[in-house]
């Protein structure tokens, strides 16, 4: 199974790149984790935000591999504690399909992305900066993997 993070935004601060890449490189060869960045639409004073959101959504869905399970990162999604995420990761592995996790831009996810999702995961009821979400998702998935393999990274 391959994990894919599809995220709006291409110019992340160095701390995001460093944190995300640290976890990305920790994933084992049998569970590769990749990042697909979608350019954010230009948001000016007179921007058509609805159209920008639609375009970002179209690009996100086009980046998802055929047959992939789509999981959105969204505040109203299901909150998973770490052991629950580990169980979820195991179910995804048993399903045999690749998993694409979608992080929207400043206005969130396009309705088309939400409609295409099989699951929606809430990291927190708080509104989080999208760059931070990349790092949180990578760390959370790595921690979940460590639980499923009895790797010493996670401690109770």
Swiss-Prot record:
Keyword Glycosyltransferase carried by entry: no
Residues at which S-adenosyl-L-methionine binds: 73, 104, 123-128
Protein's UniProt keywords contain S-adenosyl-L-methionine: yes
Compartment(s) of residence: Cytoplasm
Protein keywords: Cytoplasm, Methyltransferase, rRNA processing, S-adenosyl-L-methionine, Transferase
Quaternary organization: Homodimer.
Name of this chain's protein: Ribosomal RNA large subunit methyltransferase H
